[in-house]
């Protein structure tokens, strides 16, 4: 058992207030976002971060207790590494799946292998329906999603939304790693909401985490992550629809960058929100 990560018990003190190390940290600087060599607590968990991780664990455990069957839709991004670690080491009752759209980056597939080696577990992969995908490509071409918002949403519907709906069928709640900092639309999220679009509860335990806290947790726990993050990809999706961001851009600016910011969602995050209290 990993020190400090016993079953539901209090996290033991892994932090060391005096231990500092140089790590790559994604921070705001000179009006933009860039990687710098920053003097941070990079290889240990601070007391504050331990407490935040314990709160995530407790919220997830409470969701299981209240709702029964809970599943995590794993995006394989940085936030996903935090949740994967906490779920697999402390709340294993929660199932995990990820959507293989058929157009992911090679680095994303490599990450799946690294996670399997680290935890000796596998993330269940779900795929688009082959018949629906064939019809989509026949209608709009392989890269037709560049032509209009409707075409892009149709692609996301087949490659992401429909597989997602199949994967969550039979569950009472699903977990997401969204954070308020990520975008204006996500800033309105609540820790637990009724997802009327999909007919189950949505649990968002990382809403108030900062990007720096996410990366400090990853470094301290030595969790594998997508190496595209080291190349200015804070948000990673399908390869054709994701680019590196530039200084001063929002961290989701690299997703569907040819569209307006308010359109840069795939349809998995419902826009109509009904907060129902803490899970």
Predicted stretch roles:
Residues 2-18, 24-26, 36-279:
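Nucleotide-activated chemistry modules centered on ATP-dependent adenylation/adenylyltransferase
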